[in-house]
Amino acid sequence: MINLFISFFYFIKLFFKKQGIDVVFYYPKHFNRGEDNQNLFLKPLFESCKKHKISYLVFEEPDIKSDKKRHKNSIPFDFPFYLIILLRKFGFRDKSSANILLFLFLRNLKFKNVIVLSQSLIEFFRGLNEEAKIFDLQHGIIYSDKESYISDGKASSNISDNNVQLLLFGNGFKEILDLSDNTNYYK
């Protein structure tokens, strides 16, 4: 419950104060599997941002089913997340929810890039910023008919409709996608 309040105050503050950054990282907290609850998939990217003086924010999606703890340097995304879930119950798609939350309190959050794990909220982030580059970081095995990446010989609509690029672990996974995708989206 405390994370909801921390999140609420952080995002309400954005109503009054602009925050411009280069990269937003977003992921469900169940990926915090490392020492001190670090996200080991994103840790090298955080370190690279620090090394190259690239500004970034880390938002963690709540996961009530997970026993993983939050990382101390992340910002709980609880408040917007639960509003998005509520709006879904009323039939709003994530892009529409983004427009509503943009109007209410996210208009001062400016970013150029978004890196997510598990394709989390990519439609929402596309709705927040049509111009941003959105990346999904591979966190598991990709095979030729993995529906979250390939469906009926083409890139999944969640990826292609939101113009998402992939950050992959090696050329082998890129080749799998290239060979499986008849539309050449992944080329």
Regions found by a protein language model. Give the residues of each.
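Active-site and donor-binding regions of nucleotide-sugar-utilizing enzymes
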Residues: 2-180
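The feature marks helicase ATPase cores and/or their adjacent C-terminal helical subdomains
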Residues: 183-187
